Amino acid sequence: ATPHCGILRFTFPSNEQSRIQIDLARRVGGTSTVQYVKVVNENTIQGWMKCTPDGGGWGNGEGSADYTVYYYAQFSKPLSNYGFWSADIPDNWVRKRDEVVSIPYLTRVSQTPVITGKKELEGKHLGFFTEFPTTEGEEVEMKVGISFVDMEGAANNFKKEIASKNFDQVRQEANDLWNKELSRVQISGGTDEEKTVFY
């Protein structure tokens, strides 16, 4: 990761229909309450997720943060076969940490029909997927820039921090940054295992 971006690398088997799917509603400790996603070009999506206390969040699902996170995401494989879903989660259902992994909740999500033929969608409990053929061991990367200000900020962060980098470069730079910051701290005592846990 970088300060405002992240990169994921997926390794696939040989398959005519490999898939990456993103649950745009999920967040730490619960769900975002409304989402928007738009296909920008053959490799890119952008959008936002509104996160209110109603959807849970930090603090064991009892968080009180209220924010919108904007994203700009690019796939290394073209979005030639993609779609969306919009799960029918009743408004009176609790959307906090334990509930979003419950059987009734997951059942509703799994039974959601796929939506194709659109370039953008706004709603509650949205998801996005892209499918593509892969060869044995093929690596596919997804890079994402975020902003808590606007979509332009997410795209700018993406371009500035991660657009020209690959997974290994980003991982090495993140490792170097952590080592630089953690080298400021000197610890004494404890076992080697405890020092490793501290690090």
Question: Can you annotate each of these PLM segments?
Answer:
Residues A1-Y199:
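Beta-sandwich/jelly-roll carbohydrate-recognition scaffolds of carbohydrate-active enzymes
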